[in-house]
C-alpha cells in the first residue's frame, strides 16, 4: 500500500512543531496555519541588553565662533590704545561685537556692530566711551557706548589710569596720604594736531603757544604732524617738501629746548610724525647748599660794608 504524503512548503520545512496527525487529517493545512499563527503571536523573549546601552551619545564638536577684529586707520597710537580698551570691554560682554552707540551730535542711538563703528569713526576727531551694559529684545546683554571727542576720551582714560594706580598702591600697603593729591588727580593729556601744510606764521603764533601753555600747566602733550586728509594713503612727497617738513620739526625742537620736558618721537616725515611731550617735575633745591649760599652772601655784604667804613675811619 502506498501512503499519501502531504508536501510541506519549503518555507515551513524548518518547523518542527507540526504533529503527524495534523498533517494526515483533511484539515491538516488549516492546522498548520493555526500553529504558524500561534508561533508568530507568541511573546518574544526579552533581548539581552547591549554592553553599549549605557554609553553616552557623542555630541558633535561645537561650532567655533568667529573672532571680531577691529582695525583702526586713523588717530595716534594713544588714541588707538584708548579705543581698543573700549573694544575689549564690549567684546567681553557681547562676543559678536553688537552694541548701542549714542550719537550726541545727532541726538539718537544706533544699534550696529563694532566693525561698523571702526569704519565710521575718525580717531583724530572722535573716540569711544563705555557707559554700561543693557539688554536687547531677546534678553541678551548689549553694551551701551557713547561717541565722544578725543579730548574727553583722553581725560577719562587719564582719570581711570590714576584711579587704578591709586588702588594698586593702596593694595601694596601705601597709605592714601602718601599717595598724595598729585597721584589722585593726574593731569590729563592734551592733543595738538599740526598739518604739514601749516604756514610759519600760524605755527609760531598759534600752535607753538598752545604747546607751551599745556606744558607749563603740567599736561602731557601729544603732537601729531600729518596731512589734512590722513584717512587715505600718504601721497608721494618731493625732496623739497621733505626739507620743509624737517625745518618745521627743527623749529619745534628749538621751542622745546626752552621748556623742561622729555620728548619721545616716532614716525616718518614722509607720512606722519608723533611727539609725546612730558613735562619734568621741578628739581628740589638742596637746603644746605641754599643756606651756605646765603651765608656767603651775608659775609660778602659785611666785607664790602667794612671796606667802605675803613677809609672814613682813617680820615677821622
Curated annotation (Swiss-Prot):
<feature type="transit peptide" description="Mitochondrion">
    <location>
        <begin position="1"/>
        <end position="12"/>
    </location>
</feature>
<dbReference type="InterPro" id="IPR029427">
    <property type="entry name" value="AIM23"/>
</dbReference>
<keyword id="KW-0496">Mitochondrion</keyword>
<feature type="region of interest" description="Disordered">
    <location>
        <begin position="297"/>
        <end position="316"/>
    </location>
</feature>
<keyword id="KW-0809">Transit peptide</keyword>
<feature type="region of interest" description="Disordered">
    <location>
        <begin position="40"/>
        <end position="64"/>
    </location>
</feature>
<dbReference type="GO" id="GO:0005739">
    <property type="term" value="C:mitochondrion"/>
</dbReference>
<comment type="similarity">
    <text>Belongs to the AIM23 family.</text>
</comment>
<protein>
    <recommendedName>
        <fullName>Altered inheritance of mitochondria protein 23, mitochondrial</fullName>
    </recommendedName>
</protein>
<feature type="compositionally biased region" description="Basic and acidic residues">
    <location>
        <begin position="42"/>
        <end position="57"/>
    </location>
</feature>
<dbReference type="Pfam" id="PF14877">
    <property type="entry name" value="mIF3"/>
</dbReference>
Amino acid at each position: 500500500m502506498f501512503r499519501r504524503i502531504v508536501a510541506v512548503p519549503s518555507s515551513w520545512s524548518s518547523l518542527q512543531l507540526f504533529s503527524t496527525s495534523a498533517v494526515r487529517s483533511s484539515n491538516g493545512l488549516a492546522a498548520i496555519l493555526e500553529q504558524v499563527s500561534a508561533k508568530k503571536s507568541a511573546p518574544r523573549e526579552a533581548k539581552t541588553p547591549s554592553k553599549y546601552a549605557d554609553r553616552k551619545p557623542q555630541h558633535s564638536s561645537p561650532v567655533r565662533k568667529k573672532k571680531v577684529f577691529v582695525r583702526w586707520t586713523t588717530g595716534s597710537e594713544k588714541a588707538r590704545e584708548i579705543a581698543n580698551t573700549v573694544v575689549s570691554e564690549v567684546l567681553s560682554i557681547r562676543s559678536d561685537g553688537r552694541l548701542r552707540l549714542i550719537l550726541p551730535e545727532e541726538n539718537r542711538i544706533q544699534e550696529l556692530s563694532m566693525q561698523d563703528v571702526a569704519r565710521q569713526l575718525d580717531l583724530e576727531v572722535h573716540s569711544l566711551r563705555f557707559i554700561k551694559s543693557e539688554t536687547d529684545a531677546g534678553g541678551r546683554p548689549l553694551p551701551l557706548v557713547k561717541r565722544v571727542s578725543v579730548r574727553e576720551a583722553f581725560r577719562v582714560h587719564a582719570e581711570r589710569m590714576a584711579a587704578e594706580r591709586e588702588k594698586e598702591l593702596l593694595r601694596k600697603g601705601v597709605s592714601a596720604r602718601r599717595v598724595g593729591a598729585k597721584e589722585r588727580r593726574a593731569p590729563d593729556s592734551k592733543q595738538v594736531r599740526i598739518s604739514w601744510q601749516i604756514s610759519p606764521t600760524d605755527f609760531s603764533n598759534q600752535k607753538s603757544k598752545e604747546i607751551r601753555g599745556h606744558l607749563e600747566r603740567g599736561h602731557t602733550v601729544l603732537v601729531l604732524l600729518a596731512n589734512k586728509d590722513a584717512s587715505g594713503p600718504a601721497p608721494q612727497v618731493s625732496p623739497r617738501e621733505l626739507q620743509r617738513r624737517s625745518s618745521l620739526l627743527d623749529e619745534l625742537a628749538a621751542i622745546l629746548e626752552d621748556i623742561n620736558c622729555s620728548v619721545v618721537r616716532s614716525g616718518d616725515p614722509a607720512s606722519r610724525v608723533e611727539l609725546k611731550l612730558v613735562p619734568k617735575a621741578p628739581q628740589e633745591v638742596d637746603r644746605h647748599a641754599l643756606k651756605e649760599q646765603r651765608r656767603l652772601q651775608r659775609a660778602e655784604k659785611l666785607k664790602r660794608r667794612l671796606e667802605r667804613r675803613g677809609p672814613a675811619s682813617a680820615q677821622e
